[in-house]
Amino acid sequence: MATLPNPLPKLAADPSGTSLGLELPAGSLIDTTAEGPADEPLLWCAGETARPGAWAALRAARSTGLLPVLLDVDGGHGGPRDWELSPYELSYPGDHDADEVLGELWEAYASEDDEWPGLAEPLTLVADPDARAAEVADSLADGGSWLKDPRLALVPARRSADIPAAIGWIGAANHESDTGLLCAVLRSWEDRFGIRVVALAYDRLVLSVAAPPTTPEEAEEIAAEHFAFCPDNITQGHHGTLHAYAVHEVLDQRVWSFWWD
């Protein structure tokens, strides 16, 4: 996929990131993929569990082309070195249309009687997307979340929505093996709902939401997109219907979490 120049190789000789204007804690560069070592590092990952405030402390990294994300290294499948990252097998998110991607997934998983309703309308931001992402990251790092041992990572990517594809994450492979298609949807959600990719585990994706739906109708429209994106959220979740899922997991929610079996 097309990316900006990768600044991560500079950290091999400068682990603290001083040359990039950063003050990084101890960490490591990861280049492990399912196909063998990558030509350049895919990400930098901190060596210690993330604490509240760690995300905001690396705000300056954005100006270097590095974007933050929390990675769970203790979710039963190890950390990113064990995830069979496959960056060379994925398409570029910008080559796809979110409506077409979701429409095809909807037709594959929804009832034959249910037509794809199309994309929900954009909503009004109630928070700065990057500030909301920092808030959600702090809450995830404060314990009691889906993440067992979250580590702050930095990824060379054009936008937050591209992070999963940029590192070659394939946690949704049982649903859709080309993460580039899913990142096309994330780009659309970034534009319409102010999402940011805040955390990744082996088979889980957590987003912050700066423009959440505030009416049941808006929530149900977005819930349809969630079903196409991740049917397991509904079919294997705590809510047996799309309506119940919309009310409890989408309406007024500042966090969207997706899990694939």
Which role does the model predict for each range below?
Residues 43-48, 125-130, 171-174, 180-186, ...:
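Short linear motifs at secondary-structure transitions and domain/linker junctions
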